[in-house]
């Protein structure tokens, strides 16, 4: 069965299926995030209305949320009770749905470049990747309030390399990489490569947990630098309890 969902006024950049498989969230460049019904009568004979109160016909919107810029990413929590969507204005919005259908929304602004992909590790933690070239971690406290926690990829504090140990070939390669990946005229010093795993914007981030698991402790990111990086969260120096893992 193939059907068209109408109502978007510009490009749809990302979509995310609700865990129940009956609701779709969309991220659109018309500054809107929409939650729409994807119930197909010929297929879904007994649709579960939770947590949206009632079951609506295919294509009808349950909710429409506004953002201060293009909506660049969207994701559902494992339980399906939390929706996260990111804006080009360096904000992430967290929408909480309770079983009665009531909705509450929180906006988190962060002083970094915007993200273009989101994934939940648990109902208490979400990771975003984008133009900062470094995955960003956001967590919820015991009262359900979200905030920015840290970058996932933190700079190593190991011993510095000697400046004179870098060959002229390595210096030339570093300068070329700086020009092509970041638009810089120089690399900021011979041999001073980026310390992050990615050298350009992250375009997608995916959880690598088992289907149906309430948590995910492993994820992958891919970027415009041509790299695919696998992250084992327990091996990083990060508070696992804060992540709900």
Regions found by a protein language model. Give the residues of each.
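Per-blade loop-tip surfaces of WD-repeat and WD-like beta-propellers in eukaryotic adaptors/scaffolds
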Residues: 1-9, 32-64, 68, 88-105, ...
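Conserved GH/AH loop at the N-terminal boundary of individual WD40 repeats
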Residues: 7-8, 67-68, 111, 152-155, ...
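Canonical WD40 repeat/beta-propeller blade segments in eukaryotic WD-repeat proteins
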Residues: 10-17, 62-76, 112-120, 199-210
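Conserved loop/turn motif of beta-propeller repeat scaffolds
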Residues: 21, 80, 123-124, 211-216
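Conserved strand-to-loop turn within each blade of WD40 beta-propeller repeats
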Residues: 27-30, 86-89, 129-131, 222-225
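Blade-level signature of beta-propeller repeat domains, shared across WD40, Kelch, NHL, RCC1
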Residues: 206-241
């Amino acid at each position: 069965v193939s059907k068209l969902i109408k109502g978007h006024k510009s490009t749809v950049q990302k979509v995310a299926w609700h865990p129940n498989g009956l609701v779709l969230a969309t991220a659109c460049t018309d500054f809107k995030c929409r939650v729409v019904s994807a119930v197909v009568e010929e297929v879904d004979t007994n649709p579960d209305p939770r947590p949206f109160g009632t079951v609506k016909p295919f294509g009808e919107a349950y909710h429409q949320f506004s953002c201060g810029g293009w909506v660049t990413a969207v994701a559902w929590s494992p339980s399906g009770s939390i929706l996260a969507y990111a804006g080009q204005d360096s904000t992430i919005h967290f929408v909480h749905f309770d079983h009665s259908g009531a909705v509450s929304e929180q906006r988190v602004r962060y002083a970094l470049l915007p993200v273009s992909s989101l994934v939940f590790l648990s109902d208490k933690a979400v990771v975003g990747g984008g133009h900062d070239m470094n995955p960003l971690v956001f967590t919820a406290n015991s009262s359900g309030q979200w905030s920015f926690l840290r970058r996932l990829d933190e700079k190593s504090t190991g011993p510095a390399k000697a400046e004179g140990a870098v060959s002229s070939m390595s210096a030339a390669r570093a300068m070329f990489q700086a020009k092509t990946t970041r638009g810089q005229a120089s690399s900021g010093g011979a041999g001073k490569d980026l310390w992050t795993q990615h050298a350009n914007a992250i375009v997608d981030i995916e959880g690598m947990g088992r289907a149906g698991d309430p948590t995910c402790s492993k994820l992958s990111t891919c970027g415009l630098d041509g790299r695919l990086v696998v992250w084992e969260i327990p091996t990083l120096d990060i508070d696992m309890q804060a992540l709900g893992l």
